[in-house]
Amino acid sequence: MKADAILAELLSDSARANPYPLYHALHELGPIAPLAEGLAGATPFRAVATGYDVVDQVLRDVTFYKKGLPGRQEHTLLTTFETSMMFTNPPDHTRMRNLFSKTFTPRRLAAIDPIIESVVGSLLDQLEERGAGGATVDFVEVFAAPLPALVMAAFVGIPVEDLPWYQARVRPIDAFLDLNGKQPDVLERADHAAQELRDFYADLIDRRRRDPQQDLLSALIRKIDAGEHQLTDAELISNMIVLFNASFLTTIYLLGSGLPLLLSRPDVTAALPGNEELALDCVHEILRFESPVQFLTRAAPDDVELAGVPVPKDGVVLLLIGAANRDPARFGDPDTFEPGREKLTSLGFGAGPHYCVGAAVSRAEGRIALPRLFERFPELALAGEPVGIGSLFLRGMQSVPVTLG
């Protein structure tokens, strides 16, 4: 089967539930395969990369760039994306990234541990209350989703009472990000949500300027207003929207996808209580095995060859992160979930200049949450089939029914 046909199959419902057989089929074509036709309704990809080394090479190469989205001037969502560091190229990306990198200090990141511990303790209490008497409880609803939302709210400076409203506006934006999401009605809903979030942050920035707090947003504003970094309020708003969304979703899908995997390994769950080092191994292996972000794209700066495959100047390469993290040339027995496997870095947080700026927060959430979860509920068990979110771009669970034992 040619790469074009395999890629077209990835859009089917069955592939969204389990894309890995198709990833294996692409691996058999080599680390990168040319595409003749691209995908109707999406960016016309010129090649698809599944080999770890090729994907890693392109992500680290600063000359490969993010191609602008058509119609971005007419849509609030696309303008938001393209004025954030996640979607820009140097020098704008470098300018924005430097501000966040210098604000995410070791001291600030260390201060997040007590926040996570407090939130985890509260959510474990709620989990116990909802699961009393052997009742089935949705792990995603009660634990995995609230955890990063509450932590990020405290870290960033979003009032906790605004979180339900905020999260409702994140969903239409995520729907647009999928390969099948580029439809006019989906974009219209995402535009509306993006504008509401922009208005929300504009008001919050104004309040933080008048009354600074000990949160990330106040620290960013101080550095900008002191002239240490050049960022407009519009760019700050775009980056806050994208940063919160990315950090929030990564942890939800890390925990939601990870729980069924961990429950398949009772030897691991029995060893997790009190063992944050093992918890970090689990975090890294979950991110490899079920990457929350399944693909990224980059455009070639010139006519180039990648592993012998020609890519023309400005041609877009589809980088299948989920496939690269299952590359048998990189990972031994890649379809086996094995925390503590050889210390090889996955691409779960990306690589290169666009490496996830919130990775340390997500790792800390997993490191703290997993040992405490299985210490509190050693008999935790699945109570039904987990339900996936049904996206190709993002991979995770929307529901994981459990009993507490």
PLM feature segments, named:
Residues 1-405:
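Cytochrome P450
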